[in-house]
A protein has these predicted regions:
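Auxiliary Fe-S-binding modules of radical SAM enzymes
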Residues: 1-15, 21-26, 219-332
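Conserved Radical SAM active-site core
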Residues: 2-36, 40-171, 175-183, 192, ...
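Amphipathic alpha-helical segments that form well-ordered structural scaffolds
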Residues: 95, 134, 201, 289, ...
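Conserved strand-turn element in the central/C-terminal portion of the radical SAM core barrel
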Residues: 145, 177-181, 186-188, 201-223, ...
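Surface-exposed amphipathic alpha-helices with a cationic face
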Residues: 160-164, 199-204, 295, 299
Length: 332
């Protein structure tokens, strides 16, 4: 065990032989890097939650977890381990140089596709900052960072150096400016105001940063009032772009998300349960209608239409996200 925190979070060393996942491995059009496994923010809808069991099993098999710890992590509510048992790739920086030799210049590396690289663990271990410092010695790369945390602004200095010879974009993840929604569905994550202040610090430093609104939640955050407030806040924070896509709800995530949804939005419970009973995605008609709504707001607030996470970054994952099944919710 590496360390623990007052909220009950424990940190476990996570040895690894490779830290960069290639496009062939991920099925996406970029290389990915995740400094941690699991995420203390613990968003109820997070698609990475279901994979945490594999890290737990591996740690047990390698003797890094006792039988008692393994039983605790894989218990009846084993999904809690995702946000309270964080696996730390503490040897990542020693391996990164070797892995970088495999990445052709002009290709893209996205940091934080299956964890938040600026979750509270980063204040202790500073692995993400170390990655950026190493990447700042490169030239010709495209680097994307996805985070919900204002801690990213701590690294404005190294991000500025990185951007001198590389293409850098920071995607601040925020689904709404409504504190109630955030506390209901992202109870351990930073409040909207803190994220927006972090975004402003980045844009004030001259960095290319904006919002990623993912997921848009049918019947909760997809109405004009929610979206207009969010777009306006992004504009005030100097966002250079805003990208949005609807919810995808995989089977391994439903057991965590649906009870919370029922508690806070009982009127939507049956609709979601029916919609996601057999599939993780919603009808194309909903996705297309939502896209039109987003494009209208992009024009209204002066953002480039369809800008945000570039097509070459997330082509396949965007297609997945834009195909979610939530009938009876139809933005116009």
């Amino acid at each position: 065990m590496l360390d623990s925190r007052l909220r009950g979070t424990r940190f476990v060393a996570h040895p690894t032989r490779s830290v960069l996942n290639s496009p062939a491995q991920t099925g996406m059009d970029f290389w990915s890097l995740n400094p941690y496994v699991g995420c203390e923010f613990g968003c109820t809808y997070c698609y990475a939650r279901f994979a945490h069991r594999y890290a737990v099993e591996r740690a047990h098999d390698q003797g890094r977890l006792t039988d008692e710890e393994f039983a605790e992590y894989r218990g009846a509510e084993g999904w809690e381990a995702f946000e309270s048992r964080i696996f730390v790739k503490d040897e990542l920086l020693a391996i990164l140089d070797k892995d970088l030799r495999k990445v052709p210049l002009t290709e893209t590396i996205v940091i934080g596709t299956a964890t938040d690289p600026y979750q509270p663990a980063e204040r202790i271990f500073r692995i993400t900052r170390g990655v950026l410092e190493r990447l700042s010695k490169c030239e010709g790369l495209s680097v994307g960072i996805i985070t919900k945390s204002p801690l990213v602004a701590r690294d404005a200095d190294v991000l500025t150096r990185l951007a001198e010879k590389n293409d850098v974009e920071i995607y601040v993840s925020l689904i709404t400016t409504d504190d109630y929604v955030i506390r209901a569905l992202e109870a351990r994550s930073p409040v909207p105001g803190a994220r927006l202040r972090g975004l402003k610090r980045l844009t004030d430093a001259g960095l290319r940063a904006g919002l990623i609104v993912a997921p848009v939640l049918p019947g909760i955050t997809d109405d004009y009032d929610h979206l207009r407030a969010l777009f306006g806040a992004a504009r005030e924070a100097g966002a250079r772009f805003i990208h949005a896509s609807p919810l995808r709800l995989y089977p391994g995530v439903r057991d965590r998300f649906l009870p919370v949804l029922t508690e806070h939005y009982p009127e939507l419970s049956e609709r979601y349960r029916t919609a996601y009973a057999r599939a993780s995605h919603a009808p194309r008609a909903y996705a297309q209608a939502l896209t039109r709504r987003i494009q209208r707001l992009q024009r209204e607030f002066g953002f480039q239409v369809n800008n945000g996470m570039r097509d070459r970054y997330l082509t396949r994952s965007r297609l997945v996200q834009l195909d979610l099944k939530v009938p009876e919710v139809s933005p116009a």
